[in-house]
Regions:
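Export/targeting segments at the very N-terminus of extracytoplasmic proteins
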Residues: 37-92, 125-128, 142-148, 236-237
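Short, small-residue-rich loop/turn micro-motifs
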Residues: 87, 107-110, 165
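Non-catalytic cell-wall polysaccharide-engagement segments
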Residues: 2-34, 73, 112, 116-126, ...
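Short, surface-exposed glycine/acidic/tryptophan-bearing loops
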Residues: 94-113, 177, 185
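A generic alpha-helix surface/boundary motif
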Residues: 63-64, 104-105, 109, 133
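Soluble periplasmic/extracytoplasmic beta-strand elements of cell-envelope proteins
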Residues: 82, 105, 157-160
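Amphipathic alpha-helical recognition patches that constitute DNA-binding helices
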Residues: 79, 102, 153-156
Length: 237
């Protein structure tokens, strides 16, 4: 506990606000039991066993935790690290004014979706696990075709993580209704911006109404992907 506390206190205290995930997912009793077991397994592994020695850091002191859990969940740990940098500057014990918590700035609604008690969200392993589960759930819900480019796929998933999958899905439906590619980030980004205007958010295909956060969401996607590119150059998957 002392080692964990010292590591936590040594990080920079800087916070970026996490704008929540708008979609609501339900969890069956079977899934809930599975999630409880997975969380318990994570919590039984000492944090010290997942933290590398200081001279072994590639990206952050949480390389071990982020890498181990991301690999288990089938995600690129360098992408998850880029998200963590943007969200918290790798600060594990912070809570934003909006209630987002920890390394990945997890909102209370996300913890509830995955049956995680709020008092456990600040635990780094649980926090990173929740972020991985959320990204996997988003990717599955978007149902992007196999031929979608990796860049478009990552951009759409990140936009959903930041601005809400409901608004991204609206933008994709608008693109489709106007005869454009709903799987192109360039196209979807444009319709996210247009969803601030009545002639678009009042369209019958729109389910989540007006969206005024497109500027923040587009900047988020660009920032995270730019940092991800840098991390890919210094660390292997």
């Amino acid at each position: 506990m002392l080692k964990k506390t010292v590591l936590t206190l040594s990080f920079l205290s800087f916070i970026t606000t996490f704008y929540g995930f708008n979609a609501q997912f339900t969890t069956s009793e079977t899934d809930a039991a599975f999630l409880d077991g997975a969380i318990q397994d994570l919590q039984e592994t000492p944090v010290e066993n997942l933290l590398p020695a200081k001279d072994q850091f590639l990206i952050s002191a949480y390389d071990g935790i982020i890498r181990t859990i991301s690999v288990q969940e089938g995600n690129d740990w360098r992408l998850m690290s880029a998200i963590a940098y943007h969200e918290s500057r790798f600060t594990a014990d912070i809570t934003s004014r909006r209630g987002a918590r920890g390394l990945m700035q997890i909102m209370p609604s996300v913890a509830r979706q995955f049956n995680v008690p709020q008092e456990e969200v600040l635990d780094p392993k649980t926090n990173v696990w929740l972020a991985n589960k959320l990204l996997t759930k988003i990717s599955s819900t978007l149902r992007l075709p196999a031929e979608t480019s990796m860049r478009d796929r990552l951009s759409l998933v990140l936009a959903s993580y930041n601005g809400g999958i409901g608004h991204v899905s609206d933008a994709r439906r608008l693109a489709r209704a106007h005869g454009e590619n709903p799987n192109s980030w360039e196209v979807v980004a444009r319709y996210l911006q247009l969803k601030a205007h009545p002639e678009y958010y009042e369209n019958e295909v729109v389910k989540c109404g007006r969206f005024t956060g497109s500027g923040q969401t587009l900047a988020y996607v660009n920032d995270v992907l730019g940092r991800y590119d840098k991390y890919c150059r210094i660390a292997a998957r």
